[in-house]
Amino acid sequence: RSSDLWPDYLVFLIDNAPDLGTFTLYGHQYCEGEILPKSLYAKDPIFPPKESYIPDILSHGTKLHIGLVDIDTVKGGDLAGAVQQQISRGCRILVFDAITKRDTLHIIRTLQPLYPKVFWTGSLGLADGLAEYLYGPEQPLPPAAVRQVRCLGFCASAYEIAKKQLAY
């Protein structure tokens, strides 16, 4: 178990991708504005989601205590105090509500200096937030040259999204 190998580390989960309409609100995952079980992932041929509450989803795979820091705290509450309170209660995994890039950056900027021993996990929004925190704001790229290029792609996936990507 990872908790045995890294007993002094915490897990902070921020699962959002603001550019794609994916966010976490009161612990529930939304994709393209739809709650997870009704989102495009509901058509997943292998593992369609049955629930949306991230702490419950995570609890199926761990015995560690899981806490939630809700959007009210992220946007205007005592974020550091709320996290300390959850940790004092024995939570080793904390799920953070996050809707916007600003939410993600606020969480990282507030907590990274206080908690250096954290496994940050999440999705594209977290990756973007960590990159900006560590390296500064994204720098615009010069426009790419337009080229006439043909492409052949293969995909061995039953996922509807993969079919749409290939059709594009």
Regions found by a protein language model. Give the residues of each.
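Extracellular interaction modules
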Residues: R1
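Cap/lid and interdomain-hinge subdomains that line or gate substrate/regulatory clefts
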Residues: D4-T104
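Short, surface-exposed basic-aromatic patches at helix termini and helix-loop junctions that form
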Residues: D4-W6, T110-P113
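A generic local secondary-structure boundary/capping motif
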Residues: L25, P45-I46, A82-Q86, I107-L111, ...
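Generic preference for flexible, low-structure residues
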Residues: G27-Q29, V74, T110-Q112, L134-G136
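Conserved active-site and cofactor/substrate-binding residues in soluble primary-metabolism enzymes
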Residues: P49-Y53, D78, I99-H106, T121, ...
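Short, well-ordered alpha-helices that flank and scaffold nucleotide-derived cofactor binding pockets
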Residues: H60, R109, E132
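Acidic, glycine-rich loop-and-beta core segments that form the ion-binding/anion-interacting portion
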Residues: Q112-Y168
